[in-house]
UniProtKB/Swiss-Prot annotation:
Family label: Belongs to the GlnD family.
Taxonomic placement: Bacteria, Pseudomonadati, Pseudomonadota, Betaproteobacteria, Neisseriales
Protein's name according to its UniProt entry: Bifunctional uridylyltransferase/uridylyl-removing enzyme
Organism domain of life: Bacteria
Record bears the keyword Transit peptide: no
Region (Uridylyl-removing): 321-678
Record GO terms (molecular function): [protein-PII] uridylyltransferase activity; phosphoric diester hydrolase activity
Keyword Nucleus applies: no
Domain named ACT: residues: 679-760, 788-856
Function description: Modifies, by uridylylation and deuridylylation, the PII regulatory proteins (GlnB and homologs), in response to the nitrogen status of the cell that GlnD senses through the glutamine level. Under low glutamine levels, catalyzes the conversion of the PII proteins and UTP to PII-UMP and PPi, while under higher glutamine levels, GlnD hydrolyzes PII-UMP to PII and UMP (deuridylylation). Thus, controls uridylylation state and activity of the PII proteins, and plays an important role in the regulation of nitrogen assimilation and metabolism.
Listed EC numbers: 2.7.7.59, 3.1.4.-
Gene Ontology annotations of biological process type: regulation of nitrogen utilization
Alphabetized InterPro entries for the sequence: ACT-like_dom_sf, ACT_dom, HD/PDEase_dom, HD_domain, NT_sf, PII_UdlTrfase/GS_AdlTrfase, Polymerase_NTP_transf_dom, UTase/UR
Keywords assigned by UniProt, alphabetized: Hydrolase, Magnesium, Multifunctional enzyme, Nucleotidyltransferase, Repeat, Transferase
Amino acid sequence: MTLSAAPLQHWRQTLAEKRQQLADAYRADRDAPAFLRRYSQAVDQTLAALWREQGLDGQAALAAVGGYGRGQLFPCSDVDILILLPDPTPAEINDKVSHFIGLMWDIGLEIGHSVRTLDECLREAAGDITIETNLLENRLVAGPAEPWRELMRRLEAQRDPLAFFEGKTLEQQQRHTRHFGVSNNLEPNLKESPGGLRDLHTILWISKAAGLGDNWDSLVRRGILTLAEARLIKHSEEQLQKLRVDLHLLARRREDRLIFDLQQQVAQAWGLADTPAKRASEQLMQLYFRAAKTVNQLNGILLPNLRGRIYCQVPRVTQHISEYFHAVNGMLGIREVNVFDKHPHAILEAFLTLQRHPELSGFAPRMLRALWHGRSQINDRFRSDPRNRATFMQIFREPSGLTRTLRRMNLYGILGQYLPNFGQIVGQMQHDLFHVYTVDEHILMVVRNLRRFAISAYNHEYPFLSRLINDFERPEVLYLAGLFHDIAKGRGGDHSQLGIADADAFCRDHGLAEEDCQLVAWLVGQHLTMSSIAQKQDIYDPETVQRFAELVRTPRRLAALYLLTVADIRGTSPKVWNTWKAKLLEDLYHATLRVLSRGGEIDLASELEARKNQARAQLRLHAIPDAAEAGLWAQLDTVYFLRHEAKEIAWHARVLNRQLSPDTPQVRARLADDHEGLQVLIYSPDKPELFARACAFFGRTNYSIADAKVYTTRHGYALDTFHVFVPEHHDGDYRDMINFIEFELAAALATDQPLQLPPQGRISRHLKHFPITPQVSIRPDDKDSDFILSIVAGDRPGLLARIAKVLADYRLNVRSAKIMTLGGRAEDSFQVSGAALKDDKTALALEAALITALRI
């Protein structure tokens, strides 16, 4: 039977109106399970009516499968159906079925269909676990019931619960691997990510395949799930379902990822609003991550318990370990089921015991459940018990296993229960464009990085840091500083300062020596300082090093801050750390250590002479004649030698000693010492906009500037040095890039044509949806001779060129530029001079012009 245009329009409109009614009802009551159930029923009614109209009701069975078969149809999900044909199948049925499927699309349903006979269903299910799973959630919608019942009986008889369990658990492991990583943290998939809806489906699929029930209440009745666990899992499931319904309704398409574009809108649908401490989207993501964490925890408890029900009882191979614990089939188990109720101190001892027995693969199923329920024993009395405090500290003092232990404690909610302030930051996302992990994950990543420095198997990664930490007495203070450095995030205010009190109280409560208490608290308060100085100040200026040395005071504090700084930067995002930052930090460390070794004082005259002598030695290695550098050096003052390393001084003298006064710009480039990027030297008669033209050139050619030192010689020549990073996906070799820069940049600097800024360029999706408010500050430097211009803005191609153009327009001289890019966030610092900065009205106009240039 063929429907005319009028009935088609009727069905299309009826379905659209029903969808709208259900969506409106959902927005009013926010009841996701009810929406899913009602939408499934509405589609049932539509399909059944059309099935009958096509004359198929008595000839073939129509069944709902997959999520639709489960009665959980999301707004824009596919409607998965099975059409069960008789065998043999008359030709007219095939024609009707084809027309029926076309009708589904015509009225606005996205159909996922399979058309099979009973034997074909059995054969396909036997060979493909995905099809077997799809048919497991199978509900008759229309047509004769007996063929469908026969299919259900034969599928059940054919099913192997053991093989199904192994297949689905392997599938889950592979899915977790695919969806684990940076992109998943920022835009998690509500269905597929670890702790997502699919993890809940996996539990119920396995349970149903084993005949143990297909819902949470059934698992409670079977003793597989407790009432408390069922309440938690239902709540988390509903949270995830609500998020997914909201995503579909807002996107108007099947969108299962919490993408940047929609996070703020979903947060508004949840009634969340920005606060001074947290964006609404950050609050939303914390709700998601906590729900996912609960699912992850319970999935880890329930799957081992289901395994025990499905498999034939494996003989228990036990080995005595302690009063409370024994090894059970290669896992740590409890000797009594209520051990944590009787002896709460055994909770932390369980983690310490597993840490000391790396041959054990984890906690046995009974132990996992006992730990889960034992969390409630961790209260103020538990936290103040000296025995528990000693056990917690011993975990940090063990020679191995700290990272795994802390991650286990976090996974099962023990760490946040023992340290309530840590519990507050669990699942907290940071939309600052460079942290890609939740705060708790970032903290544990930092501790992991510190531990990795200390493990001999990884000495090759950071040899110097490995030597440093292995010479560090009582390294547990470093791990505690890592644990507390960001613990005050999200409270509002400066988290570094707020965290000092938490760290100090913990250390004193846990019996650390006064010296160590002070060190941990100091590290928490100063954990951003070394990174900021290295990337925003001139670390080759002895006075900068002197000030930093006065802050750190001792080699032990210097080493501790250096180790924590590297671990922290590497723990924010895989893309933030690079060898340029590594070099800056290591150079600052060594320079500061030299000052401390001399009693904290710098002899500027000796420092200058030492640099010149080192530069001379390098020139002689390149067969440059004695005193060849004298002509150039006569044009350079003390400031030049203070701001450049000996290697740079030697390079400049080597390439410029024969051309002190060229008429045209000279450009030389070389591979940087760290082999990450290029050093570019510009030597030219000084003129306005020279720095801006160089920045514009690098912006047009997609080279990103990390550092710039701008200097004018006594005889009026610009001697500028840039450190630039190579464009991503660049196919040419370094020699080609060097030749290109030396020729093209020299030509760009020589022209008298008006300055052409590079195109503004595309910004990242992350920055588009979480923009950074531009900030500009101008202050005198420590000598009151120049000014420090600090800028914070969202990074994009050509940003630095626009800043340089504004500075040129106001006739400001740039003496140095420190460029710090953290993900999509630019934090740039310039040392500048010029009359405009001494007039308050002009300085305000400059700030306004910069803000305009920084806006996206």
